[in-house]
């Protein structure tokens, strides 16, 4: 199963960092947010990733192209140029898709269609962390038999709010400020989801696609009661770094 990660946003609410790098490369404990997300997936056996790039996407490519030699001990034979890595390399296979700087999220996901094929896949945002059990999430999706499953979080937030009955979304409203179950990312999606994406891609996945999935009874909601956070502002970034430095890395399931 592949994990698709949305990495293209401009991160305007975190300009202290994102003037120079894309938000998924903002550091937590010396490693990018994106690295932490990928390690969560890796712990549950997901090693194939599709990164949907946009703003400063080349920085994400550079990070991973340089990753092994920067983060591992190595032996260099200067006479032959041969390099031997001494550490344990990551077993990731990463596809970097340039999806456009201003492309909306539905359009970014649509561009991944040819790389996903006819299999169920995982999707999340490049700024969200959770100690979610992906085995349970995937099993729940299979049990419900819906086209899509979203992780639902109990939180007062600026994120999308779901009305849920018997584990299925009845309505989806993006970015309200009321109490409720919010969109926590960490989706499981069947290829049927692509039928809900406009061919021009000119919309947010969190707008008409999710609303229509809910209306058609095709959006299941997996309730996660553990740790979850979205690193939406510089203050959020400082908070999770404080947690990391104090040994409270509750999302560190690996």
Swiss-Prot record:
**Broadest EC class?**
transferase
Residues that, per the record, bind Mg(2+)? 127, 232
Task: Report residues binding substrate.
Answer: 6-13, 23, 103, 108, 126
Give EC number(s), comma-separated: 2.7.7.33
Q: Which reaction does it catalyse?
A: alpha-D-glucose 1-phosphate + CTP + H(+) = CDP-D-glucose + diphosphate
Q: Which UniProt keywords apply?
A: Magnesium, Metal-binding, Nucleotide-binding, Nucleotidyltransferase, Transferase
Cite a single GO MF annotation.
metal ion binding
| GO biological processes | biosynthetic process
Give one Pfam family, short name only. Answer: NTP_transferase
Q: What does this protein do?
A: Catalyzes the transfer of a CMP moiety from CTP to glucose 1-phosphate.
Q: What is this protein called?
A: Probable glucose-1-phosphate cytidylyltransferase
């Amino acid at each position: 199963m592949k994990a698709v990660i949305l990495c293209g946003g401009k991160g305007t609410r975190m300009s202290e960092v994102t003037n120079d790098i894309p938000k998924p490369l903002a550091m937590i404990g010396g490693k990018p947010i994106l690295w932490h997300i990928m390690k969560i997936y890796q712990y549950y056996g997901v090693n194939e990733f599709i990164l949907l790039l946009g703003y400063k996407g080349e920085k994400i490519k550079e990070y991973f192209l340089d990753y092994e030699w920067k983060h591992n001990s190595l032996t260099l034979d200067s006479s032959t140029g041969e390099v031997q890595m001494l550490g344990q390399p990551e077993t990731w296979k990463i596809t970097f898709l340039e999806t456009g700087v201003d492309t909306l999220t539905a359009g970014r996901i649509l561009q991944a269609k040819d790389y996903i094929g006819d299999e169920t896949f995982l999707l999340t945002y490049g700024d969200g962390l959770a100690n979610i059990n992906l085995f349970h999430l995937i099993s729940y999706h299979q049990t419900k038999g819906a086209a899509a499953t979203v992780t639902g979080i109990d939180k007062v937030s600026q994120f999308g709010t779901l009305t849920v009955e018997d584990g299925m979304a009845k309505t989806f409203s993006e970015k309200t400020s009321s109490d409720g179950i919010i969109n926590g990312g960490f989706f499981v999606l069947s290829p049927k989801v692509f039928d809900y994406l406009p061919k021009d891609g000119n919309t947010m996945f969190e707008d008409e696609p999710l609303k229509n999935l809910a209306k058609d009874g095709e959006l299941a909601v997996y309730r996660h009661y553990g740790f979850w956070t979205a690193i939406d502002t510089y203050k959020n970034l400082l908070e999770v770094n404080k947690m990391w430095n104090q040994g409270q890395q509750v999302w560190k399931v690996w």
